[in-house]
């Protein structure tokens, strides 16, 4: 008999972030297939095709960053905080330059989509999502510090929350 271990935590912030992300992707999908741009208060940047090109590049960077984050996490990956599960503290790979590369990848990815499909509604949802992600990160940091104590504090001093640039 196998027992499945859930990878999803439970919190209002997590549920809200999933809801906002879903709405963003549905609006993008609807924009691609069915609706007129004005419905989502789209901003006309047709004169600036380089912005869409930058958006495509940024989406690609966000996608690759997300894949690298998932690969580095291996079996430690969770959606939200699972207080009853202790996983390894991952500090190598992409986690050596960002403590939160998966959240960062989502921020980058959705920002790229907004450059491709500039919309006031999408921008508002994006900023809300970035705020919710930040709150989730702060909550996760407290949890990681309580579970990994000195190891996490050492990691926290060495690697920035979002991006560590070493020159």
Predicted regions and their residues:
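Active-site-proximal inter-transmembrane loops
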Residues: 82-103
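Membrane-anchoring alpha-helices and their flanking helix-loop junctions
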Residues: 1-88, 109-167
């Amino acid at each position: 008999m196998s027992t499945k271990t859930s990878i999803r935590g439970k919190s209002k912030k997590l549920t809200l972030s999933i809801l906002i992300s879903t709405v963003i992707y549905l609006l993008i999908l609807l924009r691609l297939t069915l609706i007129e741009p004005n419905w989502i208060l789209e901003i006309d940047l047709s004169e600036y095709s380089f912005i869409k090109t930058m958006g495509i590049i940024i989406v690609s960077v966000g996608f690759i960053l997300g894949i690298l984050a998932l690969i580095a996490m291996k079996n430690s990956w969770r959606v939200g905080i699972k207080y009853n599960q202790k996983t390894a503290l991952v500090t190598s790979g992409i986690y050596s330059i960002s403590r939160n590369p998966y959240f960062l990848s989502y921020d980058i990815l959705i920002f790229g989509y907004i450059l491709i499909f500039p919309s006031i509604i999408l921008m508002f949802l994006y900023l809300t999502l970035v705020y919710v992600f930040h709150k989730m990160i702060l909550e996760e940091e407290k949890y990681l510090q309580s579970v990994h104590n000195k190891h996490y504090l050492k990691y926290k001093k060495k690697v920035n929350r979002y991006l560590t640039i070493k020159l």
